[in-house]
A protein has these predicted regions:
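Small/polar-rich, solvent-exposed N-terminal microdomains that initiate assembly or binding
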Residues: 1-66, 107-119, 161-163
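Acidic-leaning, charged glycine-interspersed low-complexity segments
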Residues: 20-26, 45-50, 94-154
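Intrinsically disordered, low-complexity regions of eukaryotic proteins
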Residues: 32-34, 55, 78, 85, ...
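Extracellular/virion structural assembly segments
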Residues: 66-70, 80-108
Length: 163
């Protein structure tokens, strides 16, 4: 995979995994909003998922040739589900986060046009309460739950061309 294309390709594939399941009978068919970036001004209908991409670093794996490098990028999915009962809202948020994890694993074998898998590996990193979100028109804040998944992939430095 070319370096200049790989970072965008991996991010695009992660987004595609989510949107593939936001259909009737999909794992995320109840999700109203998917925000695939750091946009803070985006209106959100709930249930919702907000994607944050963390810094990409070198993976622990080593390439078999000097021009191959394995990278890993953590992706954080903040999941928010509103319920009048805050405890129920937290439970539903954890359920949505678990379904996001299932979605990425279910769709991780996405194939590129040239027949390669985009993800070499997907690792669970953490599931945690991510604070609270104020929802317009609601008096109570809603709990948010984050799941962090780490995507591993390789790039070939010799194929680093201008896009």
């Amino acid at each position: 995979m070319k370096l200049v294309n790989s970072l965008a390709e991996v991010t695009s594939a992660v987004k595609q995994c989510i949107t593939n399941e936001m259909v009737e009978n999909g794992l995320l068919n109840d999700v109203e909003t998917f925000i695939p970036s750091y946009r803070l001004d985006e209106p959100m209908e709930l249930p919702g998922i907000w994607l944050f991409e963390h810094p990409t670093i070198e993976s622990d794996k080593k390439g078999s040739l000097s021009n191959l490098i394995y990278l890993k990028t953590p992706f954080e999915f903040v999941c928010i589900v509103y319920d009048e009962d805050l405890e129920q809202s937290e439970i539903l948020g954890k359920n949505l986060a678990a379904r996001v994890g299932h979605t990425i694993l279910k769709n991780k074998n996405l194939i590129t046009d040239d027949g390669r898998r985009i993800f070499n590996n997907v690792k669970f990193r953490t599931l945690y309460p991510a604070g609270e979100v104020q929802i317009d028109g609601k008096t109570n804040k809603t709990p948010a739950t984050s799941i962090v998944l780490e995507i591993e992939y390789f790039v070939d430095w010799l194929k680093c061309n201008k896009i």
